[in-house]
């Protein structure tokens, strides 16, 4: 049985929104929302074709941010507030890619959760 392709609904969004970047040691997730928190576009390093240890590189972070930003730009978003979470290597590259895709960054806030001496961290890697 042939599958029917659905046409994606194009909804114009407000020109201002937020970008949530989660840069972990293994992957990069970029979610762009409007000011109410409704998701406009999202992307991840795995969605853009990166596999394994290539997902946590600054280049993967740049490509991921560009793809999410272009989709949001096409829907009418122009100004963003950036929230960064996590210790990953592609944090700065992601912000530069957002600016390169045409979005104006109005503020940058680091919301990485820091424990007040909570759980014991994982042991150090010996490479």
From Swiss-Prot:
Q: Name one GO molecular function term.
A: structural constituent of ribosome
One Pfam entry name: Ribosomal_S11
Under Gene3D superfamilies, the record lists: Ribosomal protein S11 (3.30.420.80)
One Gene Ontology term from the biological process aspect of the record: translation
| Gene Ontology CC entries for this record | ribonucleoprotein complex; ribosome
Q: Which UniProt keywords apply?
A: Ribonucleoprotein, Ribosomal protein, RNA-binding, rRNA-binding
- The source's domain of life comes to Bacteria
Would you identify the family this protein belongs to, as annotated?
Belongs to the universal ribosomal protein uS11 family.
Functional note: Located on the platform of the 30S subunit, it bridges several disparate RNA helices of the 16S rRNA. Forms part of the Shine-Dalgarno cleft in the 70S ribosome.
- Give the record's subunit note: Part of the 30S ribosomal subunit. Interacts with proteins S7 and S18. Binds to IF-3.
Name assigned to this protein: Small ribosomal subunit protein uS11
Source organism (scientific name) = Chlorobium phaeobacteroides (strain BS1)
């Amino acid at each position: 049985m042939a599958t029917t392709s659905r046409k994606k609904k194009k909804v114009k969004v407000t020109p201002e929104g937020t970008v949530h970047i989660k840069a972990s040691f293994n992957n990069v997730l970029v979610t762009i929302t409007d000011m109410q928190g409704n998701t406009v576009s999202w992307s991840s390093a795995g969605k853009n074709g990166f596999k394994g240890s290539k997902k946590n590189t600054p280049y993967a972070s740049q490509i991921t941010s560009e793809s999410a930003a272009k989709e949001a730009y096409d829907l009418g978003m122009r100004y963003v507030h950036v929230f960064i979470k996590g210790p990953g290597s592609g944090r700065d590259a992601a912000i530069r890619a957002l600016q390169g895709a045409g979005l104006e960054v109005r503020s940058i806030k680091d919301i990485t959760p820091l424990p007040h001496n909570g759980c014991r961290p994982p042991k150090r890697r010996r490479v």
